[in-house]
Amino acid sequence: MHKKYFIGTSILIAVFVVIFDQVTKYIIATTMKIGDSFEVIPHFLNITSHRNNGAAWGILSGKMTFFFIITIIILIALVYFFINDAQYNLFMQVAISLLFAGALGNFIDRVLTGEVVDFIDTNIFGYDFPIFNIADSSLTIGVILIIIALLKDTSNKKEKEVK
């Protein structure tokens, strides 16, 4: 018998991430002009006010109807997977919560303003990474956690087959 995990923790994670994402974007949008930047960690991290009406790296710029439809489908799918497949896997619940929060955070921006507020500007190993936000970070961490969970699950299944 597997332990069924408390979904309240996952809901709290999602709510916290969405609130943190929206508050940080609000602060940037109301205190900085687009293009304004200040250095936080020399040669590594800047806060730069930027807007993006596309997806990562600006792809599909201006395709708002597409983003609305896809995001709604993704949010519904994440709730479905959370309810049906993640009840007994806390790691997967956290991953899905982070994906949900990230998708919702950027969706809120698109609905309210038609663009996403980005502000985290990094230079990693000499690569000037595209400017992103908390929602994007949440999506990235969620994807990484799902990959880890799937690899772990595959590894556990192989171990059981050997025994």
Curated annotation (Swiss-Prot):
Gene Ontology process terms (BP): proteolysis
GO cellular component term, pick one: plasma membrane
Residue positions of the active site: 118, 136
Pfam families named among the record's database cross-references: Peptidase_A8 (PF01252)
Top-level taxon in the UniProt lineage: Bacteria
Pathway assigned in UniProt: Protein modification; lipoprotein biosynthesis (signal peptide cleavage)
Membrane-spanning parts: 11-31, 64-84, 88-108, 131-151
Intracellular or extracellular location(s): Cell membrane
InterPro entries in the cross-refs: Peptidase_A8 (IPR001872)
Record's bilayer topology term: Multi-pass membrane protein
Keywords annotated in UniProt: Aspartyl protease, Cell membrane, Hydrolase, Membrane, Protease, Transmembrane, Transmembrane helix
Reactions catalysed, as given in the entry: Release of signal peptides from bacterial membrane prolipoproteins. Hydrolyzes -Xaa-Yaa-Zaa-|-(S,diacylglyceryl)Cys-, in which Xaa is hydrophobic (preferably Leu), and Yaa (Ala or Ser) and Zaa (Gly or Ala) have small, neutral side chains
This enzyme's EC code(s): 3.4.23.36
GO molecular function: aspartic-type endopeptidase activity
Record function comment: This protein specifically catalyzes the removal of signal peptides from prolipoproteins.
Family stated for the protein in its record: Belongs to the peptidase A8 family.
PANTHER family (alphabetical): LIPOPROTEIN SIGNAL PEPTIDASE (PTHR33695:SF1)
Name of the protein in its database record: Lipoprotein signal peptidase
